[in-house]
Amino acid sequence: MVAPSRYNRDVDSDIPRLQPASTGRGSSMRVDLVTVPYRYDERGEGLGAGPDALLAAGLPEQLRAAGVELTGPHEARLNPSLQEEGRTALNIGRLGADTARLVAAARRIGDGALVLAGDDTAAIGVVSGLKQAAVEGAAIGVVWVDAHGDFNTPETSFSGILAGMPVAILAGLAGPLWREAAGLATPVETEHIVLAGTRELDEKEEKLIRSTDVQIVPATELCDGDDFAQAIDRLTRRCAQLYLHVDLDVLDPRFVPSASTPSANGLSIDELVTTMTAVLQTGKVAAVAISSLNPGAGARGERSVTSAMKAIAGALPAWIATPGPC
């Protein structure tokens, strides 16, 4: 059960309310709300508290008030009997298998899955679920909106941080046991991956990315020029479904002052909304994930929660109003 909100909605009254939108398929759209309240394999710790903070701030009520037919929230869980001490990546994969189960169920009964994730490692389970529910052979594209590339492997990473590896794992360049545990049988083609809002890459990581077909649209070019629009158009033509992943550290630290991996010169909330909307309007988005919200640190955490709510409220009408993928 989610505790009463400590995020004052009167104080945060400038959070835009989602507006009802006609989908052409009836009065509402089905969205399954999935939460993955974990940092790695630890429930509710640090970033793992982010999903519950969004629930407490009233996100489900806001969605329903906008006419969204919302099921859930359904929480992905790591069975304690399957958790092995010292095998974090394998544990994350097993958690991902439950995330995949929930996402696949959402795709089979509704239009899309909105995933509130603790950290970026949840993405492997989300994509696994999309692939399990999709027609065999259907291409799935990934739009990764993040200050960081998250394209490290154990060989390229300076830190060994697992949260810096999810995109490389999705692409099949690392983590085979992790992918297998999550049920992701086939990797995502690198030509079907767009990194957007990127502004911090490790040297070896960038070299690895440049050796692939992954397209990078840096933060400095995201809202200027046609690069992002062209990248999304190309992805839409090549893929049956898209997965939109948003790491909130793509925002400038003044909007997410509690971010665990802050990166200067980030996006404004309006720029993030514009970026998300461009993807959501394609009609190909099957799942959206919001990750890396740190609600701790007192007033700084509260401001970060408010920023996340603003971004979701600003962008989601484009998803509601656009027919989704089959």
Provide a role label for each language-model segment.
Residues M1-G26:
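N-terminal amphipathic/basic-hydrophobic helices that include classical n-h-c signal peptides
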Residues L18, G24-L114, G125-V126, A133-V135, ...:
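Catalytic cores of soluble, metal-dependent hydrolases
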Residues G24-G26, A134-G137, S159-G160, L184-V188, ...:
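Solvent-exposed alpha-helices and their adjacent loops that cap or buttress functional pockets
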Residues V34, G118-D119, V145-A147, A196, ...:
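Active-site flanking residues adjacent to catalytic metal/cofactor-binding acidic residues
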Residues G112-E180, T282-A286:
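Active-site histidine-anchored catalytic micro-motif
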Residues G149, E200, L248-D252:
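Short, glycine/acidic-enriched loop or turn micro-motifs at the edges of active sites
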Residues N152, L201-E203, P295-A297:
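Active-site environment of divalent metal-dependent phosphoester hydrolases
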Residues G160-T190, V194-E203, I216, C223-D226:
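Active-site glycine-rich loop that binds ribose-phosphate moieties when present
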